């Protein structure tokens, strides 16, 4: 993809999100943890906030209702228009309910829908994309992928996405555990491979501040999506024990692992084979590595869950899903502060680099 086409893609994305400021900062749709308060706060600060998938598919209605209420009391100047909510909503397609999703999108018309994790590959994504576009033609469909092959297949499909989110191996969300590629290699390789497709690219995975954002922009991204950094926001819908761990942790390469263990301990089974999440290592993982049987691990996990915030931490047993860059997250801030600081730092870095060439 040429520099001229990359700029055209950025401009097209910005035009579809007229209230946003450049560079575009996005809060990723983390399951349950990114609720209405966080999504609206990010969009209100000139970014794009996404609601995460909900525990039950039908719970998305309550989240969208609340987001609409918040936006009604504090409208965002320059929003996409009266017919579109200036937030997005994410769906895991493998265990999502397409009928519920279509109903929710029809009612609230979010500006974007983020699709991820199909069980049946691109065919499943084609079904969801076509249904979403039929329900709300002005809603943009974002598709998260983690490999070059997925990106090329999506771009050449019968229903190519409006935006491709490229999740590098550093990400904390469920990503490809066997053929994942780091963000710094994935973004430019996809950009080159797609050539003149005209699909804007959003970088995700390992980005928690303006330094990562600046790097992603130079690689060809039109914006950046952050998950772990927004876990340390005052609006995040998570327990204090979880959030304390996000701020405390360091050395993500050493202290995190990709595994389905914590999903299973929490009673979540059935994720498609290519995917696994990244979590902080604690007693559950160390005991698993030592050969403790799953049934015993489950008992200890469930006992730990009854202790509240003490269930997290190096000696805890509960899941703390984070990205490899967790060591760069050092404090809790309001979401608006995170958006502004990331944007301003990225601008300053890029300006400085150009000035010194």
Curated annotation (Swiss-Prot):
CDD domains linked to this entry: NPD_like
Where is FMN bound in this sequence? 167, 172, 206
Q: Which cofactor does it need?
A: FMN
Q: Which Pfam families is this protein grouped with?
A: NMO
Listed SUPFAM superfamilies: Inosine monophosphate dehydrogenase (IMPDH)
MF terms from GO for this chain are: nitronate monooxygenase activity; nucleotide binding
Gene3D superfamilies for this protein: Aldolase class I
Cofactor note from UniProt? Binds 1 FMN per subunit.
Q: Which keywords does this Swiss-Prot/TrEMBL entry list?
A: Detoxification, Flavoprotein, FMN, Monooxygenase, Nucleotide-binding, Oxidoreductase
Annotated GO biological processes are: response to toxic substance
> What are the EC numbers?
1.13.12.-
UniProt keyword annotation of Nucleotide-binding present: yes
Listed InterPro entries: Aldolase_TIM (IPR013785), NMO (IPR004136)
Family under the similarity heading:
Belongs to the nitronate monooxygenase family. NMO class I subfamily.
Record's function text: Nitronate monooxygenase; part of the gene cluster that mediates the biosynthesis of the deadly neurotoxic nitroalkane 3-nitropropanoic acid (3-NPA) that acts as an antimetabolite of succinate and irreversibly inhibits succinate dehydrogenase and disrupts mitochondrial oxidative phosphorylation. Catalyzes the oxidation of 3-NPA to nitrite and malonic semialdehyde.
Name of the protein in question? Nitronate monooxygenase npaC
According to its UniProt entry, this protein's organism is Metarhizium robertsii (strain ARSEF 23 / ATCC MYA-3075)
> What taxonomic classification does the UniProt entry list for its organism?
Eukaryota, Fungi, Dikarya, Ascomycota, Pezizomycotina
Q: Which gene encodes it?
A: npaC
């Amino acid at each position: 993809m040429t520099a001229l086409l990359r700029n055209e893609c950025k401009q097209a994305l910005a035009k579809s999100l007229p209230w946003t400021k450049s560079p575009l900062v996005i809060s990723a749709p983390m399951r349950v943890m990114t609720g209405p308060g966080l999504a609206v706060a990010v969009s209100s600060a000139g970014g794009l906030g996404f609601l995460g998938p909900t525990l039950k598919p039908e719970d998305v209605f309550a989240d969208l209702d609340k987001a609409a209420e918040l936006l009604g009391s504090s409208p965002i100047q320059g929003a996409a228009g009266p017919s579109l909510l200036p937030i997005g909503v994410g769906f895991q397609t493998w265990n999502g309910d397409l009928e519920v999703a279509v109903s929710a999108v029809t009612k609230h018309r979010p500006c974007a829908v983020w699709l991820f994790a199909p069980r049946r590959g691109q065919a499943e994504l084609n079904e969801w994309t076509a249904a979403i576009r039929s329900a709300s033609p002005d809603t943009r469909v974002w598709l998260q992928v983690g490999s070059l092959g997925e990106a090329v297949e999506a771009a050449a499909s019968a229903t190519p996405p409006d935006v491709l989110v490229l999740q590098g191996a550093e990400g904390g969300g469920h990503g490809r555990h066997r053929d994942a590629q780091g963000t710094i290699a994935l973004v430019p390789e996809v950009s080159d491979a797609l050539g003149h497709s005209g699909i804007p690219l959003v970088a995700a995975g390992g980005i928690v501040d303006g330094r990562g954002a600046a790097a992603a922009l130079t690689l060809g991204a039109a914006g950046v999506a952050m998950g772990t950094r927004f876990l340390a926001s005052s609006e995040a819908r998570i327990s204090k024990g979880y959030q304390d761990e996000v701020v405390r942790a360091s050395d993500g390469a050493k202290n995190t692992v990709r595994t389905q263990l914590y999903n299973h301990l929490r009673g979540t089974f059935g994720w498609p084979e290519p995917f696994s999440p990244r979590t902080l290592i604690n007693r559950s993982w160390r005991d698993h590595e030592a050969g403790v049987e799953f049934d015993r691990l489950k008992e200890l996990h469930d006992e730990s869950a009854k202790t509240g915030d003490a269930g997290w931490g190096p000696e805890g047993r509960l899941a703390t899903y984070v990205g490899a860059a967790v060591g760069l997250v050092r404090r809790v801030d309001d979401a608006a502060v995170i958006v502004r600081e990331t944007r301003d730092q990225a601008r300053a870095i890029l300006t400085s680099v150009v000035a010194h060439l």
